[in-house]
Regions:
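N-terminal auxiliary segments of SAM/dcSAM-dependent transferases
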Residues: 1-48
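Short small-residue beta-strand/loop micro-motif enriched in glycine and branched aliphatics
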Residues: 48-50, 192
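The AdoMet/dcAdoMet-binding core of the Class I SAM-like
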Residues: 2-8, 57-192, 198
Length: 198
């Protein structure tokens, strides 16, 4: 891949569009229990992560996604003390949540522990808050976790998932949203990633 002609391309199904980055090297590839995880060194976006062939983040611009999925929701709530992140295995959203001093508990419920471990290795700047005493990293099914939550036990829910395929498909089902609604307090806020705009 050092010849400058290598590209990683994500194609958007039958829509006739794609996005690609020139890459210098493949740094990591594995098939976890749930999905294929790849890390590349790109020419212009630093390291990039792909899951099942879809771009998840890059060193250069991940902050746009992580800040925007987090801060508007937390600033919209008058006192966001209890925050749940469903997904978010790269830990960037958790890091942004914990910038809010009023947050007392932040749960990150990620089904695939390998996403977090790979992120700790290749994107350590995103994982700096993993040891914060307010953070609880749980490697479990977020759908089942939400089903078990008592009523009025959360202030903010952030659904930081992949697109609605594979293990994330259930995160787009009405039953999951009923469970979220029950778990949120009266002024609760829910925000979610809702697929690529392309």
């Amino acid at each position: 891949m050092s010849n400058g002609d290598a590209w990683v391309i994500e194609r958007f199904g039958d829509e006739g569009s794609a996005i690609g980055l020139a890459v210098e090297a493949k740094l990591h590839e594995e098939q976890s229990e749930f999905q294929k995880i790849e890390i590349y060194q790109s020419r212009s976006y630093g390291k990039v992560m792909l899951i099942d062939g879809c771009f998840m983040l890059s060193e250069r611009d991940h902050f746009i996604y992580h800040e925007m999925i987090t801060h508007p929701a937390l600033f919209s709530h008058p006192a966001p003390r209890r925050v749940a992140i469903i997904g978010g295995g790269d830990c960037g959203t958790l890091t942004e949540v914990l910038k809010h001093r009023g947050v007392e508990q932040a749960w990150q419920i990620e089904i695939d522990e390998r996403v977090t471990r790979v992120s700790e290795q290749y994107f350590p700047e995103l994982c700096g808050s993993n040891g914060d005493p307010r953070a609880q990293l749980l490697f479990a099914d977020g759908i089942a976790w939400m089903r078990e939550r008592p009523a009025d036990s959360l202030d903010v829910i952030i659904i930081d998932s992949t697109d609605p395929v594979g293990p994330a498909a259930g995160l787009f089902h009405p039953d999951f949203y009923r469970d979220c609604h029950r778990a949120l307090g009266a002024q609760g806020v829910l925000v979610q990633q809702s697929e690529s705009p392309l």
